[in-house]
């Protein structure tokens, strides 16, 4: 399967290392880079994480915007300027930069949340609050997911 699924909570050690779930690493196995790209979410107080191929798709979308627009500049700055390449160590861990941990409020635990083509890393209690709100929205908007066939 080529999508990020499920939710996992893993500990963050004193060196800011955290283990990326094995099935997430399996999804990334086809990427050219043995690691992930992480950047601060522009929607939530979490970290968005993806492979190089998804960053390329984001680049293509952003390049459709006027090259001198505020929107393009903001997206390039927030996604590309703040992005970091995180390599996997021999145990499947990455080192989370302090700037990203601060953005997400992560200290001792990290909650990995599969979102299809990306995954997010949250402070666990913050994710539970978001999940409660998302459940309400999904319930209210459930009819927008209609079968296209």
From Swiss-Prot:
The keyword tRNA processing does not apply. It is found in: Cytoplasm, Nucleoid. Keywords: Cytoplasm, DNA-binding, Repeat, Transcription, Transcription regulation. It comes from the Bacteria. Residues 7-54, 83-126 form the SpoVT-AbrB domain. Pfam families: MraZ. Transmembrane segments: none annotated. Disulfide bonds: none annotated. PROSITE patterns: SPOVT_ABRB. GO terms for biological process: negative regulation of DNA-templated transcription initiation. GO terms for cellular component: cytoplasm; nucleoid. GO terms for molecular function: DNA-binding transcription factor activity; transcription cis-regulatory region binding. Forms oligomers. Belongs to the MraZ family. PANTHER family: TRANSCRIPTIONAL REGULATOR MRAZ (PTHR34701:SF1). This is Transcriptional regulator MraZ.
């Amino acid at each position: 399967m080529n999508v990020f699924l499920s939710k996992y909570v893993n500990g963050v050690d004193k060196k800011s290392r955290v283990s990326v779930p094995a099935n997430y690493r399996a999804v990334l196995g086809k990427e050219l880079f043995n690691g992930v790209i992480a950047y601060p979410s522009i929607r939530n107080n979490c970290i968005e994480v993806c492979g190089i191929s998804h960053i390329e798709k984001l680049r293509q979308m952003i390049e459709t915007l006027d090259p001198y627009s505020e929107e393009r500049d903001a997206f390039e700055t927030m996604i590309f300027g703040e992005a970091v390449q995180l390599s996997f160590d021999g145990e499947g861990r990455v080192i989370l930069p302090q700037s990203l941990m601060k953005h997400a409020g992560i200290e001792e635990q990290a909650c990995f949340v599969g979102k299809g083509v990306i995954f997010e890393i949250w402070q666990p209690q913050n994710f539970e609050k978001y999940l409660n709100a998302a459940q309400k929205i999904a319930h209210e908007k459930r009819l927008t997911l209609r079968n296209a066939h």
